Amino acid sequence: MNRHASILILLLAGHAIGSVQAADRDAYEADALPFFKEHCLRCHDDTQQKGEFRLDTLARDFGTQQSAERWAEVLFRINSGEMPPKTEPQPTTAEIGKVTEWISSQSREGEATRMARRGPVAHYRLSREEYAQTVYDLLGVHFDPSMPGALNDDPRWRGFDRIGSVLTLSPSHVERYFRAAETILQQAYPATPTPSTVNRQTAVAPDRWLIYPSRLHGGIQAPVPGLYRIRVQLSALPSFKGRLPRLSLWNNSLKRAEVGQDILASEDQPTVVEFQTFLPQGGFQLINEAPGKLDDGPAVGNTPTTVRRLQDYRPSPTGYKLLLEDGRPIFPLLLVDWYECEGPIVLEADLKKRESFFPPELNADPPADPQKLDKRLRDSRESLSRFMASAWRRPPATEEVDRLMRLIEAERAAGENLRSAYLAAMAAVLTSHHYCYLVEGSAIQPREQVNDWELASRLSYFLWNSMPDDELFAQASRGNLHQSDVLQRQFQRLLNDPKSRRFTESFPRQWLQLHRVGQFPPDPERYPDYDKWLERSMVLESTGFFHEVFARNTSIREFLRSDWTVMNARLAMHYGKEFPPAAGFHRVPLIDTDHRGGVLTQASVLSLTSDGTRHRPVHRGVWVSEAIFGRTPPPPPPNVEPLEPTPSNKLKATIRDQIQAHTTHATCAACHQKIDSLGLAFDNYDAIGRWRTTEKVSGGLGDDPTVYAGGSFPDGRTYDGPDQFKKLLTEDLDRFAESFIEQLATYALRRAMTIDDAPHIRAIAAASKQDDYRFRTLIQNFVASPRFRQR
C-alpha cells in the first residue's frame, strides 16, 4: 500500500494528475485521495489494470473530453455500487459522499471550462425566441417559430436555451432558416396587400349564445397571417363552486387556444372584451376553456345553443340539466351577445420599420431610361446597406454590400424583376450567419473585450431578447458605449423600456425551468380539478411574480420568502383564496395560513418537480439545489428501483417513509443526506401544488397518514415545515445571491460559468449587498462589472 501511495503522490506533483489550484488540491487530498488509496489502487495501478482501467495515471484535467469521460466512469462505478467489489472492504456513507462530491464538482467545472473555451471569434446562435423578437423589431412582422415546420426546437442546458456551445447548426436548421426568411419577407412586403375588414356576428335579440365548457362557437377567419383585433360582448355564469368560465380564441388547425381571459361580468351587466393579437392564417372559434368534465358536476351533454335568461330556461324531461334546484349553474357558462374581428391591421410603427429598408419605386414597373434605372439601383444599394446594418447589428463592409448587389444582378440576369431580385438579397441577409448568430471577436485582431457593436448586442439581447434600437446603434457608432457612464445610461434606458418585459418573462422561465410544467400531465382521476388554463396560470404566476420584483426593485430575498404573490381567479380558486377584483393577474397579500410566498411554494415549481401522479421529494430537492444554491447533485446510481405502492396488507406509508427506507444503502444515503432535506420540506404540497395535511396513499391499511415536513440542513439547523424552511433560506441570502448572479450571468453571457468567473460573481454580490440585494441594483452591478465587457 505504501508503494502505491508513493507512486500516486509522485504523480500528483507531476504531469499525470496535473497542476491544480490550491483549493482543488486540498479538497482532493482530503476527500478523494484517501478513498482511492484505500479502495481503488490495489486493482487499478501500474501493476494491475482490472477492466483495462488505470486510475493512478488518470489526469485530473477535467477540461478535456477524454479525461472527463473516464472520471464519469469512475463516478458511475462508485454510485452503482460496483466499485469497490463486494468482496473488498466497503467505504462508509461519508466516504462515498466526499469522493462523489469531489468528482461531480470537478466534472461540472470541467464541463463549464469546455463550454466556455472559445477561439478568437465566438458565434452564439439566436434562440427561437430571440429570432422571432428580432424579426419583429427589425421588420414589424410577427413570426411564430413554434408553428409546424417553422424553426427547430432549441436544446437546453440546465434550463437555459441560449447557451452558445449547445445551440449548434444542422442542415435542417439551414433549410428552415431559408423558409422562414421567405415567409417573413412575404408578410413584410406582400405583392398585393390584403385590405383590413371588420366582420361582426350578432345573436338574434333577445336571445344570446350559450357556450358550455370546452365547447366551440362561431367562426372567425384570418385570410393572411397578421395582427387582428377581436371584440366580444358577453357575460359569465360561474358554477355553483365558483369556477369562472374563460373565453379563449381556439385555433382550429393547431388545436390550441391563442389568447383568452377569465370572465367575471354578471348576466345582467355584460362586458366587452378585446384582444389584439397576431393570428396565423386559418380559422378560429370562440371557446369556453373551462374543462368539459369537472368535479362540479357530470360531463356536459346535449344542450341548447341560445337562451334569453338562464333562469328562464326549463329543460324538457329528456333535456340536459344546467341548474341546481336553487338556480345556480352546475357548470361555468358564457353568454355571448356578439363578436367581431377586424384585420389584418398594420400598425404605423411597423410600417415605418419596413419602408426604411425597401425603396417604394421597386413596386413600380422598371424605367426604360438607363439613368433612372441606375438611380433605382443606387437607391436599392443604400436601402440594402441600411437593412444589412440593422439585421447584422453592425455596419457592413463595402465588399459585403457589393456581394449582395452582385446577387441582385444575377437574379435580374436570370429573368427576375428588380423587386424580386432585391427581396432575394434581403433573404440572403436574413439567412446569413451574421443575422442568425451573435458574432464576437476578430480573427484578424484577437481581443479579450467585445467592441462597441458587440456590447450593444450583448446588452439588448440580455434585457430585450432582441437587437439594439437606433439609439443604442448610435452610441456604438460613436465608439463610446464602453464608457461606464454611457453604458449605465443606456442600461437604465433599456431597463425602463416596455421591451424589458421580455427579460422578465424569458429569464425566469429558464432559471426556474418552467418549460417542465405540464411535461407529465397529472392523472385526471386523481386531480380532476387540473386543466390547461390552470397549467398556464401556474407559469404566469411565476413570471408575473418575477416581473413584480423587477418593477418594484425589491430585494431578491422575495424570491425565497414574501408576504404577497400575483394570481388570477383560476389560481385563487386553486389556492383557496378570494378572487381578485378584476380579470387578469393582480398582486395579492398573503397570510401565514396561506403557506405561500416566494417561488418555492408556487404551484409551477411544485408541479414541475412531480410526476403527474404524486409529489417527488427527491426531484424537489434537486431543483432547490440547482435553482437556489447553484449546485447540481451527482447523478443517481443506474437502475434505481422505483418506490413501490404500499402493499394491501401493510399500513399506509408516506413517500417520505419509503424514501428513508430506500436510503439505508450507503451508495444511496450519501447523496440523499444532502438532497432530501431540501425536498421533504415541501411534503405539505401535492403533485399540483395544493396544500394538504394528510397524504393520500393508494392501497394499504388504515387512514391516510399525516404529513410531516420537518427536517434539518446539512449544517444542523432544523425546520418544521416549508415556512420555517424558507425563513432559514433567507439567512443564507449571501449564498443565494451568488447563485442567482451566476444564473443571471449564464443567461446574459450565453455560456457556463467557470471557476475564473467566481471572483467576479463574489464582487458583484458584495457590491449588491450594500443595497440589500435590490434586483435592479444587482443587475446594474453585473452590467458594470468587467466580466460583462469581456469575451
Regions picked out by a protein language model, each given a short descriptive name:
Residues 6-16:
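Bacterial N-terminal signal peptides
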Residues 8, 19, 94:
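Alpha-helical and His/Cys-centered functional microenvironments
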Residues 18-24:
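Boundary at the C-terminal end of the N-terminal hydrophobic targeting segment
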Residues 25-51, 66-73, 78-82, 86, ...:
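Low-complexity, glycine/serine/threonine/alanine-rich intrinsically disordered linker
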Residues 56-59, 84:
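Residue-level detector of conserved, well-ordered beta-strand and adjacent loop positions
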